[in-house]
Curated annotation (Swiss-Prot):
Keywords: Cell adhesion, Cell cycle, Cell division, Coiled coil, Developmental protein, Fruiting body, Repeat. Residues 12-92 are annotated as: 4 X 7 AA repeat of T-T-T-[IV]-[AQ]-P-P. It is found in: Cell surface. Required for correct organization of the actin cytoskeleton and cytokinesis. Also required for apical sorting of prestalk cells, a prerequisite for formation of the tip at the mound stage and subsequent formation of the fruiting body. May be required for cell adhesion. This is Defective in tip formation protein A. Residues 38-47, 59-94, 210-234, 254-279, 430-453 have a biased composition (Low complexity). Residues 1-20, 37-94, 109-133, 210-292, 429-453, 712-745 are annotated as: Disordered. Residues 350-383 form a coiled coil. The lineage of its organism: Eukaryota, Amoebozoa, Evosea, Eumycetozoa, Dictyostelia. Residues 48-58, 235-253 have a biased composition (Pro residues). Sequence repeats lie at residues 12-18, 40-46, 60-66, 86-92.
Length: 1402
């Protein structure tokens, strides 16, 4: 039994899964069988078969262990791997007729199958063992099945492990083979990979070192795998098995079978094999790890396969691949991972080429996908997430903030900490909290009478100053605050409940003597608030909200505040119409008797662009007209300030007879049926091609203005007839006066709309629609008829003027549609100006933009007297071709446009398009020079000449220069004795000189060389007296943009680089705009020996403040200011010894001026580039300070607190000695304290202590140094943190009440002086807080230091800390500056029942 128990233990063997068969007589047990890639070994379940002639009693057979045959082909190979699936089933037990023929072979743990079995025992003992066998029959069967199953499972596990190791070894060998192939390719073709390729260099250097180790590793792996597999299997080949086949042994007894199964030697061998297997497996794992580390070390820059492949493909040249052999191409394809077969060289090359092209296409698609993704992120950057009110942050930042919030919210420790700070205010320790609680209990009991302080729920709690102020439901009563905070849901809820709401702060103070400015401001705030409400709440479901709003709060909305500026139902209705809130407008008309006004209401409705709103207002007005016949018809004049009314709206106006344009009515509604006044749905439909198109009507205003004159004349005639005035002369005089007044009004109003032209604000689509409208209504011919009637109707000529129809390039709708087909969809949405500019820069044929030119000509031809700027732009763009009226020539055009005033915009446009007409007509040189001086200060890139002229179009450029050149010579010769600059010889020279400088600014050396040859007098230099500052400040260095142009000008025009000053020539260094040009200029001066007599070395750098103000645009941008300081630092360093710095010159003092931009852009923001510029400014400034004895003023240098803070940090860290008395930093003690506070260093000010006033007898301790400006800023900006530091650190009088009493008893005079000083400063602080609306200052003092506001305490019985005069002053300032929330706080919370009216009466 012990042997049986021992045999049940699991066995671990290294052989392959055996094959189990029962052998019949004369059957070869070693006959091999074919094994496929998937070998399945099936073990049949045991079956008990009865013999053919069973005797009686039944015979019991003794079953020996089954024969186990090993499978063949168990050795591992490096090329292919086999997967063996073994299905383990219980062995089949057969009871043969003769037991002696059953051979049982049990050699599971023997090294080979040739071992001989044990001899057959004696027959004498057979009878004795029969009983034992019968007793152990069941246990033996179970025992045999369990043993076989366990053995098969173990063998299967071992086989799977071997296969896994084989696959790993094969992968490693393949990797080594790929590296060897690539190394051979590099060695054979060195020119294949460029030497600059980093990957090839690494392979080239490290491959020789790895070659020996990789070959040795490959041999070791192959030998180890083969040895281990052979040791595990140890199976002879099939031929040896057949030769060593022993004769069938007899059946052994049961104890002998157990001895064969588990001998001690086999157990020891098995343990040794297990240990060897574990060791080899560990060695193999370590080797693979080592190889992996080597690969990571070698490919540390190519961790990603795509990057690894990209670096390989960078070094491959497809043209060189064609010269390689087929074997080399296959190696390259194998290295790249391209599948290779038995292909020819051409096929292999095509496969590699297609692989490389496909890889490039994939990378391109990936880049396009990333770019689209980035664009989507940018477009979604300002969208809201979860109804957030953060508009400035992109979506990613909002999501990160939300994630951070929920992480903190789930953290119990952080959540309790934050809630604890919110509950106690976050500022004070436990003792101060207790004092605050005691004070709060006192205030609640004392102020329980007021409605705002009756309970804790009525207070304006300000728990945390870090996050925000928190208000309770009943405290939110101001509608303006609710609307500004976008809490429209809260507004709806409060209106539905009928809660208390304050719509206008002015209603709380109803005084009779209110200023007009206050009324206007109140009306503006009211309109702004209701505009937000109408724009946000406009759905049909909100009808109940507006009904409750207008019903329950009518006294606050519709009642008039005063007699001058009423806020009534008309104003509210007009706001609803303007905001296109159809729900509120319908409700006001139907239930609240709101009646729209003809001109104003309809104008607002058309301006909104909503057809439904226009229809509602028009039908309402039309009903009123039917009831009131005195209403005048609607005039086209209301379109003067409206943009883009639709054709559908115009149809409705024509239908209801509100559009009084006689010719259009005759053309359009001649065949229309009569329209019922009450019919709202009967809409006239005309011109189906223009039904849904939109046009810009504001730019067509000038085409209809002549009708106003006719209407005015007709109205005057009608009025005169009604008044029975039959004097024709009077009528004629009235008509003439009306015409003259209209013309004068047109010229005055023209200055407001002069820049609104087709070339500035029109898109191509709007231009096409406007031309369609002109052709449809035949407006051009109608205008000409009215124009000639107005000018020639009352003339004395007997001959009648014949009025003929004018012919234009476009006369029919088909021509416009043909032009429209030639324009792409993308160009239709572009501005006309941009399309024309692109066409001009391309220098294409005229046919390319002839269609746009014809459309512009048709538009400009309509009423050219009021479209002179359009005519001017058309002329400078398209040349001398006149599209305006025939009686308006070129000279009249310029005289009519601007005869007395120089227009810088027209001058700029003429330079950009290369049109010389405006330059020639206006001969005032001073105005041109003044424009260029201002231009340099306002524009960063001021290159204007030939901006929209193609660089290849030299003919147009030379033509422009020639006309101006000849005109300047003619003017100089004709008026040589003139006194002014314009028209004189000097004026002509200056005119040519200005043109010459602009050509230099264009930075075109080819054009400049041609101009010098053809126009030699253009470069003549003329010295001008300094009195004329505008002309004096234009110098050649300001126009040079490159080093090449500097070298050319220095060698050819040297006289232009020196200035007359103090009867000596001085170089103009500050005209250059960057230090590189200045350094090059100094190099040219040093290298040139001919100028030694003129250029004086060690010359003084002198200039006036005005020179810098006009010459260098130091205030235009931060970049230019940085360049300016770099130039000053370069001059201070003086590498060539050319400059001597005068220490107190205004030149250096101008460096400390504020570098704020003209657009108000701050110096620093989160942009990294601007931070780097700021660092460069600091480094340049430090260089200037080190090389000179200049004193500087920090307050003048930087106005922003963030800039000043960084600058003071730099001073404290690097130049702290400048802050001492008499130091280079010029600043007073008060200003220094103020600057320290603005730099965030209030602690330094507070540590200085008190200063003493020695004006009176004895020294009096009054206040810390220079805190007056600091306290003003605390009240101005609402800085409660600094206020608390000031109260706790600087004013010991207010720490405790007992301390104050003791101080008063010790030295009454000194204490009273300090007390009065505190009063003054606190009243000033509260005054600033009341002016700027900082209610948090009042809340902080009231809830934490209430004794400052308490007048009834014993402490201030003799004199309150803040007197009544101070409180009255605060109330008046709150009233004057419209800070009514602070006024409510003072009256209701603090408890001062004083009104501004009472204060004024007293």
């Amino acid at each position: 039994m012990k042997d049986i128990e021992a045999s049940k233990k699991p066995h671990t063997t290294t052989v392959a899964p055996p094959q189990i068969n029962f052998i019949k007589n004369n059957e070869n047990i070693f006959q091999p069988k074919p094994i496929s890639n998937v070998t399945t070994t099936t073990v049949q379940p045991p079956q008990i078969v009865s013999p053919p002639s069973p005797p009686s009693p039944p015979q019991t057979t003794t079953i020996a262990p089954p024969t186990i045959l090993p499978t063949t082909k168990t050795t591992t190979t490096t090329t292919t791997t086999t997967t063996t699936t073994t299905t383990v089933q219980p062995p089949q037990i057969v009871s043969p007729p003769i037991i002696n023929n059953l051979i049982i072979q049990n050699n599971l743990n023997t090294p080979s199958l040739s071992s001989t079995p044990s001899p057959l025992p004696n027959n004498n003992n057979s009878n004795e063992n029969d009983n034992d066998i019968n007793n152990l029959k069941i246990s033996k069967e179970e025992y045999q099945t369990q043993i076989e199953i366990q053995q098969q499972i173990q063998r299967q596990q071992i086989l799977e492990r071997q296969q896994l190791l084989q696959r790993r070894n094969q992968e490693q060998l393949d990797l080594l083979e790929r590296h060897n192939d690539y190394q051979e390719l590099i060695n054979t073709h060195q020119n294949f990979v460029p030497p600059n390729n980093r990957f090839s260099q690494q392979i080239h250097v490290s491959q020789l070192k790895k070659q020996s180790s990789q070959s040795q590793l490959q041999q070791q792996l192959s030998s180890q795998s083969l040895q281990q597999i052979q040791q595990k299997s140890k199976q002879p080949p099939p031929q040896q098995q057949q030769q060593q086949q022993p004769p069938p042994p007899p059946i052994p007894l049961l104890p002998q079978i157990h001895q064969q199964l588990k001998p001690k030697q086999q157990q020891e061998q098995q343990q040794q094999q297990e240990q060897q297997q574990q060791q080899t497996e560990n060695e193999r794992i370590n080797e693979l790890r080592r190889l992996k580390r080597k690969k990571e070390y070698h490919n540390d820059e190519y961790k990603d396969d795509e990057i690894y492949l990209d670096n390989i493909l960078k070094g491959i040249d497809i043209r060189k691949l064609e010269k390689l052999t087929a074997v080399e191409l296959r190696k390259i394809g194998k290295t790249l991972g391209v599948p290779m077969g038995n292909n020819t060289k051409g096929e292999t090359f095509q496969r590699i080429k297609s692989f490389i092209e496909n890889h490039k296409k994939k990378k391109q698609k990936y880049r396009e996908y990333q770019s689209e993704k980035n664009q989507q992120q940018k477009s979604n950057s300002k969208k809201l997430v979860n109804n957030s009110t953060i508009y400035d942050l992109p979506i990613k930042d909002i999501e990160h903030l939300e994630q951070l919030f929920w992480r903190i919210f789930r953290n119990i420790v952080l959540f309790r900490k934050i809630i604890g700070n919110l509950s106690r205010g976050g500022f004070f320790d436990q003792q101060q909290q207790q004092q605050q609680q005691q004070q709060s209990t006192m205030t609640t009991t004392s102020s329980s009478s007021s409605p705002m302080t009756s309970s804790d729920d009525k207070f304006f709690y300000c728990y945390n100053y870090i996050f925000s102020k928190t208000f309770k439901y009943d405290q939110i009563i101001h509608v303006s605050w609710i609307v500004d905070s976008n809490y429209f849901g809260l507004l709806k809820y409060k209106v539905s409940r009928g809660d208390l709401l304050v719509f206008c702060n002015h209603n709380t103070i109803n005084d009779g003597d209110v200023n007009d400015d206050e009324d206007q401001n109140t009306k503006y705030e009211f309109c702004k608030m209701f505009k937000k409400i109408f724009n946000s709440i406009r759905s049909i479901q909100d009808k109940s909200f507006y009904r409750d709003l207008f019903t329950n709060y009518s006294e606050f909305i519709f009642d008039r505040i005063n007699k001058r500026y009423p806020i009534d139902i008309y104003l509210v209705g007009s706001l609803a119409i303007e905001c296109n809130c159809l729900v509120a407008t319908k409700l006001l008309i139907s239930e609240f008797q709101f009646r729209p006004v003809m001109n104003h209401s309809l104008q607002l409705a058309i301006k909104s662009g909503s057809y439904k709103m226009v229809k509602l207002i028009v039908t309402t007005i039309h009903r009123q007209m039917s009831l009131n016949p005195n209403n005048k018809p609607f005039d086209i004049e209301m379109f003067s300030k409206i943009n883009n009314p639709s054709i559908k709206i115009i149809n409705l106006l024509i239908q209801l007879r509100l559009f009084t344009y006689s010719n259009i009515i005759n053309l359009v509604i001649a065949d229309a049926k009569l329209i019922n006044d009450n019919n709202e749905n009967d809409i006239l439909q005309f011109n189906k091609n223009l039904k849904n198109q939109i046009f810009n009507y504001s730019n067509l205003l000038n085409s209809f203005t002549f009708n106003n004159n006719i209407n005015n004349n007709n109205n005057n005639n009608i009025n005169n007839n009604n008044n029975n005035n039959n004097n024709n002369n009077n009528n004629n005089n009235n008509n003439n006066n009306n015409n003259n007044s209209n013309l004068s009004n047109n010229t005055i109003e023209y200055s407001k709309i002069k820049t609104k032209t087709v070339f500035n604000q029109f898109t191509i689509k709007q231009l096409i629609n406007s031309c369609k409208l002109i052709v449809t209504f035949d407006l051009k011919n109608q205008y000409q008829q009215q124009y000639y009637k107005r000018h020639y109707e009352d003339s004395d000529n007997e001959e009648e003027e014949e009025i003929t129809q004018a012919s234009f390039t476009i006369n029919t709708m088909a021509e416009i549609e043909f032009i429209e087909t030639q324009i792409t969809k993308e160009e239709k949405h572009c501005f006309v100006k941009k399309v024309i500019q692109k066409q001009l820069l391309k220098d294409g044929e005229k046919e390319d933009y002839d269609g746009i030119k014809r459309l512009a000509e048709l538009y400009v031809s309509l009423n050219p007297h009021l479209k002179v700027y359009c005519n001017f732009m058309y002329k400078i763009i398209y040349g001398n071709e006149n599209c305006y009226d025939q009686d308006l020539d070129d000279e009249d055009l310029f005289d009519y446009r601007v005869t007395r005033v120089f227009d810088s915009n027209c001058f700029k446009q003429s330079l950009k398009y290369g049109s010389p007409g405006y330059w020639i007509e206006y001969k005032e040189v001073e105005m041109k020079y003044a424009f260029l001086s201002n231009k340099y200060r306002n524009e960063i890139t001021p290159n204007l000449l030939f901006k929209y002229v193609s660089p290849n179009n030299l003919n147009k450029q030379l033509k422009f220069i020639k006309k101006i050149y000849n005109s300047s010579i003619e003017n100089g010769n004709s008026n040589g004795n003139g006194n002014g600059n314009g028209g004189t010889v000097i004026g002509g020279i200056l005119d040519r000189l200005l043109l010459f400088y602009l050509i230099i600014e264009n930075n075109n050396l080819e054009l400049l060389s041609i101009v010098i040859k053809e126009f030699p007098l253009i470069s003549n230099f003329c010295y001008i007296a300094k009195s004329n500052s505008e002309i004096y400040n234009l110098k050649i260095p300001r126009f040079i943009r490159s080093i090449e142009m500097l070298e050319f000008c220095f060698s050819n025009f040297r006289d232009h680089f020196y200035l007359p000053q103090s009867n000596s020539l001085t170089a103009d260094f500050y005209g250059f705009q960057n230090v590189e040009l200045l350094r090059k200029y100094d190099q040219l001066m040093v290298l040139d020996d001919m100028d030694k007599g003129i250029i004086v070395s060690n010359k003084k750098v002198r200039a006036s403040f005005d020179d810098f103000h006009f010459i260098f645009e130091w205030g235009s941008s931060l970049k230019n200011y940085n360049n300016y300081l770099k130039m000053l630092a370069y001059i201070v360093e003086d590498p060539y010894g050319l400059y001597t710095i005068v220490t107190n010159e205004i030149l250096l003092l101008s460096a400390i001026l504020s570098p704020t931009t003209s657009s108000g852009e701050p110096l620093l923001n989160l942009n990294i580039e601007r931070q780097l510029i700021f660092q460069e400014i600091i480094s340049s400034f430090s260089t200037i300070l080190e090389g000179t004895e200049l004193k500087y003023y920090p307050e003048q240098m930087f106005q922003e607190s963030t800039h000043l803070k960084r600058f003071f940090d730099w001073i404290f860290e690097n130049r702290s000695e400048d802050l001492l008395i008499g130091g280079r930093c010029v600043i007073t003690q008060s200003v220094q304290s103020h600057m320290l506070y603005r730099a965030g260093r209030l602690d330094i000010v507070l540590r200085k202590g008190y200063y003493y006033d020695d004006t009176n007898e004895g020294s009096k301790k009054i206040m810390p140094v220079g805190l007056a400006l600091v306290l003003d800023d605390i009240g101005k900006y609402g800085d409660v943190v600094a206020l608390e530091k000031y109260i706790r650190s600087c004013i010991p009088l207010m720490k405790q009440q007992s301390e104050l009493l003791t101080l008063l008893d010790k030295d009454e005079r000194e204490s009273r002086a300090c007390f009065s000083q505190c009063q003054r400063h606190f009243s000033s602080l509260l005054s600033k807080a009341s002016i700027y609306g900082r209610i948090n200052i009042f809340q902080h003092i009231f809830y934490n230091h209430q004794f400052i506001f308490d007048k009834k305490s014993l402490l201030f019985a003799r004199k309150g800390f803040l007197s009544k005069i101070s409180f009255k002053k605060l109330i008046l300032e709150c009233h004057y500056h419209k800070q009514h929330h602070i006024l409510d706080f003072i009256q209701n919370v603090i408890g001062l029942d004083i009104t501004p009216k009472q204060i004024k009466s007293n």
